[in-house]
């Protein structure tokens, strides 16, 4: 608030001294840049909840994908183990059947 109160006397003093064109252009440029910064700050403040929500959704989606990948890996491992056990059982039954025929 202090800076706004200081700007009004500064503007009055500048107008009383009849400033040169370059100085006025410089002050106008500074004012426009300051106003642009304020607008960007307001836009960022207004939009920040939406970006935080989208980040949270992205993180949740990544967690779900990781869980699905882990489940698929465990199912694949179980399938391999079950397939290996079935093959062993087949080989054992064949061996037993061969023994029965041989005797």
UniProtKB/Swiss-Prot annotation:
Location in the cell: Mitochondrion
The encoding gene: G0s2
Record flagged with keyword Repeat: no
Gene Ontology cellular component terms for the protein in this record: mitochondrion
Record's subunit section: Directly interacts with BCL2; this interaction prevents the formation of the anti-apoptotic BAX-BCL2 complex.
GO biological process, one term: extrinsic apoptotic signaling pathway
Keyword terms of this UniProt record: Apoptosis, Mitochondrion
A Pfam short name: G0-G1_switch_2
Protein name from the UniProt record: G0/G1 switch protein 2
TM helices/strands, residue ranges: none
Entry annotated with the keyword Zinc: no
Main localization of the protein described in the UniProt heading: mitochondrion
Domain of life from the UniProt record: Eukaryota
